[in-house]
């Protein structure tokens, strides 16, 4: 199954296409004034069976595109567990806030802290 993952942030929209849990391709676009338009451009590329969104605009994406949503915390933990199985933490410095996530075994979230800029 091919999955399109979208991180719809306040400054950029990041896309990754996965098959069997492995990355096939990735792209980034500026969010601009309409992050959903940037997300739509990635969706229109096709080549996916399923879409999941995270980030600042995830709920709008669910309304616009009917995709599944996950929190950024869960998305980061899952990604770290797949790409860096020994990772103990994740740091995200985003356009809206900064997050620090402590990971346990298999990418399980042990704790996290977040501050707004």
Feature-to-residue mapping (PLM):
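Glycine-rich phosphate-binding loop of actin/hexokinase-like ATP-binding domains
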Residues: 72-117
